[in-house]
Regions:
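Bacterial N-terminal signal peptides
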Residues: 13-24
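Short, compositionally stereotyped local motifs that mark structural "simplifiers"
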Residues: 29, 61, 513-650, 691-696, ...
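Contiguous, structured surface segment used for ligand recognition
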Residues: 30-165, 490, 502, 506-532
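Feature activates predominantly on carbohydrate-active enzymes
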Residues: 106-333, 374, 378, 477-480
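Active-site neighborhood of glycoside hydrolase catalytic domains
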Residues: 296-400, 406-414, 418
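Flexible, acidic glycine-rich loops studded with aromatic residues
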Residues: 386-401, 407-560
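Extracytoplasmic
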Residues: 618-795
């Protein structure tokens, strides 16, 4: 794939302009034909009446002597055989049902695809364009589950990408992805016409690339011992031979692999391997890091304090590392991170302070700018360009540096106005470790919800950028941080189907994007994901069951009014009440959209496309007294002034789905909202001790310690608020992290509907306590106790 340059971005713009002038084709904003299985949507599509039927044995003809076209055609035939069971034969020269042609002009990634009764023609001037034409044809060939011959619609497509950088970032430092999984992701990216795979190869928790001159970077830095010692060792790395193979595999799919080695911060794994290149706080030049010890490779997520030193020896080490990086990676851009570099070690080091003084620098931010400038100059001497997260703006940028903006879009705006190229990757719109919905069945991750529509609605070019500055927007990138993504299944759940929305934003023109037209095509993409074995989330289409008026009202009335819906408002919802699996022939909702159900009820529901295809897995909801009195972790609220920011697993390195818990790292406190307390005699809490493995840096002092009455602490239950009457104090047993706890206690008699505050008083330097579910249990008739009861009698 050609290097990303301003010239390439101009070619993208020129291609789109040329397509706009092609009067024979439909305008971009014209209504999209129904259910064409194309994602991303092309720049121009014009229906052509009768289409083409492809039978087994149909020929793909490529220009004589065009080895690259033959390779692309062979790959297309292999994909169609894999996903359709239709065998196509590639031949050099002559006629064919499918013909590859070289256009005489046009940008290398633009293409035309014509499907007529006489055959299909794919034409482009460059290899990338031919490849993307093949992707579009493959999508049309695999629009449904039918195997064998396919009837293709008649149409003419003229297409080119809007942006030159259409990227996806995979963090392999926090959790390592084997080569086979990365190759699977590369193939999935190619199917969406994404063209940059950004690999986050180093962080505090692991160093993932072999550096032959410094073998301890992987012998030591690639491995860690998780909290609790299970497994005894976790990690992995890529040899240079493996990485070259990955790069070649990606290049065949017109994807550039961009490496990231984080510096000067997020350096703990490297410093664990070579402490002499960390910061000498003691000031005596001894080969050690931190306060007179070699750190372990971190098991804590978040922000850790370790930095690279800024002496000549440490800079030579980084240059040696970069020499091997540029020998492996042909990409123009080398990502150096630059984010979240706490300056505490630099501030505490006499040697670093002397270095700052000798350089005439007045702040540690200025020192980071000097550091980045030095690395940028070195990369420039190797013919490469530096790119880093938007923190590298602090203190000034090297002249040829580019910025990847994650803290919103302000960094991109500032850099573009300074004349620097930018890539947009804002956390609020493109960080795919945020959960796809607020459903109970979402796996671990950040609790900040990132629904697919927010991805689709993201616009990379801010309206306040004028045309000259907008030309510096190279594109955008979705980022998958993997603290809570330890397996391929969870990786695919996090990425798909949001990658489809990302691809359309990155490829299609702004005017061509249409959410309502995207949804039917997304349904076809979801069905294809299932056939391919991709573990895509169905959160967007899954039926959500909500009790209208609240659970307390349903308990009082002995019946529940429920609303059935899904996140995207697409499909027809059907349900059953007899335990059977809903089908396209099951009951539909009344006009009000509400169901009134006597207690108890067992509701099963799903959404269906117009052709009767289920859009998700059916969801089951029991609506009875026990369920209405239970709050899962996901249904508990944060205590006042708090925030439930993470959805954590029971075991940090579990490679499969595991129990998950919504937690506030700063305060182990939850609110059970609107509890109906009439007749309640007992509270049962399913709790857990989790690893407290999240680096809070300077915020660690804000963690709340509630006073304890026993060595291991208690779970307190307060009425109304966290300062209300103490209803129960459940003593915690001794134990360690990754344990589940079953806690129960009688409750004194109370009436009405009130909140309950539940908070742990355990030592904040030990495990993190969390709640899985809280159940209120009705007392046997005549067994409730009046308020108040002495707290001691409730333990």
């Amino acid at each position: 794939m050609p290097a990303m340059t301003i010239g390439m971005r101009r070619m993208c713009a020129a291609a789109l302009a040329a397509l706009t002038m092609a009067g024979a084709l439909a305008a971009t904003a014209a209504p999209q034909p129904p259910a064409l299985a194309l994602v991303p949507w092309p720049a121009q599509v014009a229906p052509e009446g009768a289409g083409l039927r492809l039978e087994s044995g149909a020929v793909i003809a490529v220009p004589t002597g065009d080895a690259e076209a033959e390779k692309i055609a062979t790959a297309l035939a292999a994909r169609v055989l894999r996903d359709r069971g239709l065998r196509l034969i590639v031949r050099s020269g002559g006629a064919g049902a499918i013909v590859f042609k070289r256009a005489s002009d046009g940008p290398p990634d633009a293409y035309r695809l014509e499907i007529l009764p006489t055959g299909a023609t794919l034409s482009a001037s460059g290899d990338a364009g031919l490849f993307y034409a093949g992707v579009s044809l493959w999508q049309l060939c695999t629009a449904n589950a039918t195997r064998g011959p396919v009837a293709l619609p008649g149409l003419r497509i003229a297409d080119a990408p809007r942006f030159a950088w259409r990227g996806l970032m995979l963090d392999v430092a926090r959790h390592f992805s084997p080569v086979v999984d990365v190759k699977a992701l590369i193939e999935e990216m190619a199917q969406h016409k994404l063209n940059v795979l950004h690999l986050h190869l180093s962080d505090d928790q692991g160093w993932r690339l072999e550096i032959k001159r410094y073998p301890d970077l992987t012998r030591v830095g690639a491995w860690r011992t998780p909290p609790g010692g299970q497994p005894a060792q976790y990690g992995g790395f890529y040899t240079q031979a493996q990485m070259r193979d990955l790069i070649a595999y990606a290049a065949e799919r017109h994807i550039t692999v961009v490496p990231e080695l984080d510096m000067p911060g997020h350096a703990q794994a490297a410093v664990a391997a070579y402490p002499q290149f960390g910061v000498d706080i003691a000031g005596d030049g001894a080969p050690r890091a931190g306060r007179n010890r070699r750190p372990a490779v971190s098991v804590d997520w978040g922000v850790n304090p370790y930095l690279f030193n800024v002496d000549d020896r440490s800079l030579r080490f980084l240059e040696d590392v970069l020499d091997e990086v540029v020998s492996v990676f042909p990409s123009t851009f080398i990502h150096v991170g630059g984010d979240e570099a706490l300056k505490d070690q630099w501030k505490a080091s006499p040697a670093v302070q002397r270095r700052m003084q000798s350089l005439g620098l007045r702040s540690e931010d200025a020192l980071q700018s000097w550091f980045i400038d030095r690395i940028g100059e070195y990369l420039a001497s190797k013919g490469r360009r530096l790119i880093g997260w938007d923190e590298i703006l602090e203190g000034g940028l090297p002249p040829d540096a580019s910025v990847m903006s994650w803290r919103g879009t302000d960094g991109a705006l500032a850099a573009a106005r300074m004349g620097h190229d930018v890539v947009l990757a804002p956390a609020g719109s493109l960080y795919f470790d945020g959960r796809q919905s607020e459903r109970d069945d979402e796996p671990e991750g950040r609790l900040g919800q990132l629904p697919i529509k927010r991805v689709y609605d993201f616009e990379p070019v801010a309206p306040e950028l004028d045309a000259a500055h907008a030309r510096h927007v190279m594109g955008l990138e979705g980022a998958l941080w993997t603290e809570y993504v330890p397996s391929r299944q969870l990786m695919e759940h996090a990425l798909f189907p949001r990658v489809a929305a990302l691809a359309e934003v990155a490829w299609s023109t702004r005017d061509a994007r249409n959410w309502e037209a995207f949804l039917p095509r997304l349904v076809l993409a979801q069905q294809r994901y299932r056939r391919q074995g991709i573990a895509a989330a169905d959160s967007a289409f899954a039926v959500q069951v909500d009790v209208v008026g609240g659970r307390a009202a349903a308990l009082a009335a002995g019946k529940a009014q429920v609303r059935l819906s899904n996140q995207v408002g697409f499909g027809e919802i059907r349900y059953t009440l007899d335990g059977s699996t809903p089908t396209s022939g099951s009951s539909t909702l009344p006009a009000s959209g509400l169901l009134e159900l006597p207690l108890p009820a067992r509701l099963r529901a799903n959404a269906f496309a117009q052709d009767g295809t289920p859009l998700a897995a059916p969801r089951t909801q029991s609506i009875d007294v026990a369920n209405l009195l239970t709050r899962s972790s996901n249904a508990l609220n944060a205590c006042p002034d708090g925030e439930l920011g993470l959805r954590m697993p029971l075991r940090p390195e579990a490679s499969d789905w595991t129990p998950v818990f919504n937690v506030n790292l700063m305060d182990s406190c939850w609110i059970y909202p609107a509890a109906r307390l009439d007749g309640i005699g007992e509270i049962v809490v399913d709790a857990a001790r989790l690893a407290r493995n999240y680096g809070l840096a300077h915020d660690a002092v804000k963690v709340v310690q509630h006073p304890a009455a026993s060595p291991d602490g208690e779970l307190e239950v307060h009425l109304g608020s966290c300062t209300g009457t103490l209803l129960a104090s459940l003593r915690l047993p001794a134990g360690s992290a990754t344990q589940t706890l079953a806690l129960r206690a009688p409750l004194p008699a109370s009436t009405g509907v009130q909140d309950l505050c539940l908070r742990f008083t355990a030592d904040i330097h030990g495990p993190l306590h969390a709640i899985d579910a809280v159940r209120l249990v009705p007392a046997p008739q005549g067994k409730t106790q009046p308020l108040p009861l002495p707290a001691s009698s409730l333990r």
